[in-house]
Amino acid sequence: MDVGGALDLYGCSVNVYNAILIFIWVLFLWETYINLRQLKVAKRVTESPEEIKCLMNDVDFDKSRRYAIDKMNFDIVSGFYNILSLSAVLYFQLIAWAWHKSQEHMLFVCSYAPRSFGTTEGSEILFSLLFTVYVALFQFFESLPWSYYRHFVIEERYGFNKQTIGFFIKDRLKSLAVGLVIGLPIISMLVWIIKAGGHYFYIYAYGFTFVVSFIIMFIYPEFIAPIFDRYEHFPDCELRKKIEELAASIEFPLKKLYVVEGSKRSSHSNAYFYGFGKNKRIVLFDTLIKGFKMPGVEADSSANADESSDETQNRGCGDDEEILATLAHELGHWKLKHMTFNLIIAQINIFFMFFAFGQLINVDQLFVDFGFPPSTAPILIRLIVVFQFIFMPYSSVLEFLMTMLSRKFEFQADAFAVSLKSGEKLKSALLVLTKDNLSFPVYDWLYSMCNHSHPPIIERLAAIDAKMGKEK
């Protein structure tokens, strides 16, 4: 196979294809190495650490250990498949093949359409849209068996999966449809902006993505998330009153409080907030609250009887103060402006990537190695090659740094909850969630450093104790 020539970079001859292929395999081997380190820890440690024995006995610990081993083995095998698949895409120049097929099929369709429909000026956008659909369909079918195994074998084995096969397929199809409905217009506009924007197109492209990102941040929780899960206003009760008092005590502008029926798909629990300015919402998963029933569930309880179990009903925090402590942690992210900081970093990163793309867009040799002769690579392909492959080392380093920053933010949010006198309840809530989610509490330091955006439970408990000691 012809993989193109070499790129002259500051007097050095660099084969782009070989460099990318070497990097993705080095990255895969590194990730496999640290996964094997963690797998070794999970197999070696067979007794619950003293710090969490008060809640997780050896039986529960062994179950969490087996769960961790199963997930780790799955990640290693699926990772090996993914690297083989990506290598095949590069080696056989399948990106170019898919693009040419998109051209052929779109030209065939246009031959039966009005003459103006397939004009040369707009044809690249049409080709880009069909190419995107083909890639989305390929990824949909390629990931389907892996997702099925994760949910219906691993998650099912440990009592987490609550989806039926019908729900699973429908959920995946909805994700595909929503992704295309949102993604295709964005791709159309982005290709048009880059083609028409001249030398400073990267400024206009960044401005467009900036606006789109804020629009999506607004419409996703209000209009898109309810497509996948049922959201209800949190019922009037003592817990609701306490949550509103907590929000008011730190001047959090809470406008609405929701509960989401996460139990329909999984027993895992969560809580989060969203919104702009003085229009914030808090969302609690029904699985976070022990014994919680979604409004109206009694009316169809017989139909859903098989979807719930005593084990599921016994999961979650049974103490209101534990739930409040969990929310105090989440609201700490808002009070300490972590979300704003992350948003600023994201915008700087997007602008930098578009600026760098502006310097590389006309370096034809980058795209020859992907099967496109000089000056023939379309805009969308140039975006994919540069953003996904050329920037891969940069993106990997940035991802690691953001993981480290996230860990720091988690410690700070825990400390904020302690400052609200919720330290002990936060500890007990973390222990409950660790047990309920079968989170294996012992980690290899290198694996944890590279993979955990949230610190391990033992580190968090120690930090909370240290903070409470200083507060006394």
UniProtKB/Swiss-Prot annotation:
pH dependence: Optimum pH is 7.5.
Species annotation: Taenia solium (Pork tapeworm)
GO molecular function, one term: metalloendopeptidase activity
Transmembrane annotation, as ranges: 9-29, 76-96, 125-145, 176-196, 208-228, 341-361, 383-403
Comment on bound cofactor: Binds 1 zinc ion per subunit.
Compartment(s) where it occurs, according to its Swiss-Prot or TrEMBL record: Endoplasmic reticulum membrane
Annotated GO CC locations: endoplasmic reticulum membrane
Cofactor(s) the protein requires to work: Zn(2+)
GO biological process assignments: CAAX-box protein processing; proteolysis
Enzyme class, spelled out: hydrolase
Gene name tied to this protein: TsSte24p
Catalysed reactions, as listed in the record: Hydrolyzes the peptide bond -P2-(S-farnesyl or geranylgeranyl)C-P1'-P2'-P3'-COOH where P1' and P2' are amino acids with aliphatic side chains and P3' is any C-terminal residue
Active site: 330, 414 (proton donor)
Temperature sensitivity of activity: Optimum temperature is 37 degrees Celsius. Loss of catalytic activity at temperatures above 50 degrees Celsius.
UniProt protein name: CAAX prenyl protease 1 homolog
A Pfam family matched in the record: Peptidase_M48
InterPro entries, per database record: CAXX_Prtase_1, Peptidase_M48, Peptidase_M48_N
Domain of life: Eukaryota
Residue positions binding Zn(2+): 329, 333, 410
Family classification: Belongs to the peptidase M48A family.
Keywords per UniProt: Disulfide bond, Endoplasmic reticulum, Hydrolase, Membrane, Metal-binding, Metalloprotease, Protease, Transmembrane, Transmembrane helix, Zinc
Primary location class: endoplasmic reticulum
